[in-house]
Curated annotation (Swiss-Prot):
GO biological process, one term: protein unfolding
Major localization class: cytoplasm
Function, in words: ATPase subunit of a proteasome-like degradation complex; this subunit has chaperone activity. The binding of ATP and its subsequent hydrolysis by HslU are essential for unfolding of protein substrates subsequently hydrolyzed by HslV. HslU recognizes the N-terminal part of its protein substrates and unfolds these before they are guided to HslV for hydrolysis.
InterPro entries the record matches: AAA+_ATPase (IPR003593), ATP-dep_Clp_protease_ClpX (IPR050052), ATPase_AAA_core (IPR003959), Clp_ATPase_C (IPR019489), HslU (IPR004491), P-loop_NTPase (IPR027417)
Localization, UniProt: Cytoplasm
The keyword Nucleotide-binding is assigned to this record: yes
Gene Ontology molecular function: ATP binding; ATP hydrolysis activity; peptidase activity; proteasome-activating activity
Upper taxonomic lineage: Bacteria, Pseudomonadati, Pseudomonadota, Alphaproteobacteria, Hyphomicrobiales
Record-stated family: Belongs to the ClpX chaperone family. HslU subfamily.
Name used for this protein in its record: ATP-dependent protease ATPase subunit HslU
Length: 433
């Protein structure tokens, strides 16, 4: 788990996301509070519960991007799910407890990756011996092995093909056990029941270079205690897990509506115990959810936060409102982030030998077009910039292979020539921009 201070977390998010200071502060404090709780002892640590967050704001202003960047920063098990993917228990579809099961799988993969690094040196030696066995045979003399080992370490044998025995991928057929609680837990792999069937292997023909990572991972896994690894992963989920629930507004029940809304309310009711704290059965063991941090987000265009069940509102105590993007924000989004759209397009066309240059007035014009179309057609926030940029650079992208070595300057006139008419014609921009 990361121990960044809130200020460091915000400054890291600032590298990729423009504006939305309140939302950044809220998630930074929530993330730091996870670390603070782990410094406490005994009963107090158990009593301190996470303050779950509800992010409210129109589409395309950075809600999901904040979640994505937070996942990379957190160094903790993180899962982003759409609330609309789930159905009430008893209906066909996934139930909300699957969120926790998926989170456990994410944690196991993270812990396994970390532990593999701890035993990498030993795994590398064992993998090297397996490659030498394939090259010169297990019964070869020490002198021959040493000679080939030197060549192997120098990289002289990287292109040589060898045959190695590797673990067969666990693509065991799945079947459902009727009546098992929690819907998806009923899908059991035959491999889970009968174990690894004596460790099934298959012979693969690979180059020495390609076999390197596969063999190291296999040898590392042999050195790991799987039961201890799973237990550690469950512990990490219970104390550090973060779930980002997107599109929470789509499961709101609006006043005066009925019929299909029933299962939406059911999903909310199923979420209540999960967020409040319950024990979820997974195939790896029971997982307590009291200390998992939930961050919910929604545009709330049609529904309002007050349309959520009152109990669910109470379980999301921190409200953060994200602002709609202004023209100045659009301009900054085009230029400031480390992987801004303009930098991406310049890099893409550089691969063809074409140098793109954007003048300041071109950036102003792009921002103006995006804001104009958002205000007249449908406000989709920063995502509109991608549509506008694609339209502006359509011709250049098409002919780039024939124009290697050229420098092309994009100015306001060029932008207007390519999208100006479409932006003014509302009927056309509905379909094209």
């Amino acid at each position: 788990m990361t121990d960044f201070s809130p200020r460091e977390i915000v400054s890291e998010l600032d590298r990729f996301i423009v504006g939305q200071a309140d939302a950044k502060r809220a998630v930074a404090i929530a993330l730091r509070n996870r670390w603070r709780r782990l410094q406490l002892e005994g009963i107090l640590r158990e009593e301190v519960l996470p303050k779950n967050i509800l992010m409210i704001g129109p589409t395309g202003v950075g809600k999901t991007e904040i979640a994505r960047r937070l996942a990379k920063l957190a160094g903790a098990p993180f899962l982003k799910v759409e609330a609309t993917k789930f159905t009430e228990v008893g209906y066909v579809g996934r139930d909300v407890e699957q969120i926790i099961r998926d989170l456990v799988e994410v944690a196991i993969a993270q812990v396994r990756e970390r532990k593999r690094k701890d035993v990498q040196a030993r795994a590398q030696i064992a993998a090297e011996e397996r490659v030498l066995d394939a090259l010169v045979g297990p019964g070869s003399s020490p002198a021959t092995r040493d000679s080939f080992r030197r060549k192997l370490r120098a990289g002289d044998l990287n292109d040589k093909e060898i045959e190695v025995e590797t673990q067969a991928s666990s693509g065991s057929p799945m079947f459902e056990i009727p009546g098992m609680p929690g819907g998806q837990i009923g899908a059991i792999s035959i491999g889970d029941i009968f174990g690894k069937m004596g460790g099934r292997t298959k012979t693969r023909r690979l180059t020495v270079a390609d076999s390197h990572d596969i063999l190291i991972n296999e040898e590392a896994d042999k050195l790991l205690d799987n039961d201890q690894l799973v237990q550690e992963a469950i512990n990490v989920v219970e104390n550090n897990g973060i779930v980002f629930l997107d599109e929470i507004d789509k499961i709101c029940v609006r006043d005066g509506r009925s019929g299909g809304e029933v299962s939406r309310e059911g999903v909310q009711r199923d979420l209540l115990p999960l967020i409040e704290g319950t024990t979820v059965a997974t195939k790896h063991g029971a997982v307590k959810t009291e200390h998992i941090l939930f961050i919910a987000s929604g545009a709330f265009h049609i529904a309002k936060p007050s349309d959520l069940l009152p109990e669910l509102q109470g379980r999301l105590p921190i409200r953060v409102e994200l602002n709609a993007l202004t023209r100045d924000d659009m301009r900054r989004i085009l230029t400031e982030p480390e992987a801004s759209l303009i930098k991406q397009y310049i890099a893409l066309l550089q691969t063809e030998g074409v140098t793109l240059e954007f003048s300041d007035d071109a950036i102003d014009a792009l921002a103006d077009v995006a804001v104009g179309v958002n205000s007249t057609v449908e406000n989709i926030g920063a995502r509109r910039l991608q549509t506008v940029m694609e339209r502006v650079l359509d011709e250049i992208s098409f002919v780039a292979p024939d124009r290697g070595g050229e420098t092309i300057r994009i100015d306001a006139d060029y932008v207007q020539k390519n999208v100006g008419d479409l932006a003014k014609n509302t009927d056309l921009s509905r379909f094209i921009l």
